[in-house]
């Protein structure tokens, strides 16, 4: 399945340019304004949002804020013909992954898109692996209703959130390694 990229620009010519150049590698969706784009973000999974900064109605900066409120992990690239250093800094502070000036060189845009999607894939994979480790080594893997076991689970949760060094002691076969892994993977 091709990654879905949403292009938001009030110029149909720019929308078409992206469709022609990116269509072979990506599923390209277009929107003419910020309101249409938000509807797409709410209803469809989008891998990347590329938006113009200056548009009638909702501008690109507001779209960035609203889209990330709905979907915080959505990478957003802002493009503009009216670039300023202050605008770029503000966009990056708001969460844009990049801020590029028009006219756009499509080769550079394709490299930026691939880099952005690679970072997103790595973040998704990292999140998935962390969840898997949590399910394998989290405190829920330690079973028992005895107050002593419940106290161990509580202690694991307490120390895992700190930078403290922990020494786990006990006789052979008492579950020291399980406790150590639970602390490690919750840290």
Regions found by a protein language model. Name each.
Residues 33-36, 59-62:
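Acidic catalytic/metal-coordinating carboxylates
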Residues 55:
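Receiver (REC) domain active-site loop signature in two-component systems and cognate sites
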Residues 12-30:
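Two-component/phosphorelay signaling modules centered on CheY-like receiver
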Residues 130-187:
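AAA+ ATPase active-site-proximal loops
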Residues 94, 102, 145:
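A Lys-centered signature of the CheY-like receiver
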Residues 52, 80:
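Active-site residues of response regulator receiver
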Residues 26, 42-44, 66-74, 94, ...:
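Conserved phosphotransfer cores of two-component systems
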